[in-house]
Amino acid sequence: MSYKKLYQLTAIFSLPLTILLVSLSSLRIVGEGNSYVDVFLSFIIFLGFIELIHGIRKILVWSGWKNGS
């Protein structure tokens, strides 16, 4: 898997993982009764997933993983 593919997977899977985690933690993104805290927490989780995957990519590149061109 190339660096470019991993970057694309980051974009594809970050939002679904965020929605899944927020749903499992009993927060509601869609529906009645949303508070600004719920939306804020879901946004923080979303950013966390993006940073986690970016960090994994940096470690892979640092360890000598090639771009796969």
From Swiss-Prot:
Gene Ontology CC: one annotated term: plasma membrane
Keyword Nucleotide-binding found: no
Segments on the Cytoplasmic face: 1-6, 62-69
GO BP: bacteriocin immunity
Keyword Cell membrane in record: yes
Membrane topology according to the record: Multi-pass membrane protein
Regions that span the bilayer: 7-29, 39-61
The protein's name: Microcin H47 immunity protein MchI
Lineage: Bacteria, Pseudomonadati, Pseudomonadota, Gammaproteobacteria, Enterobacterales
Gene that specifies this protein: mchI
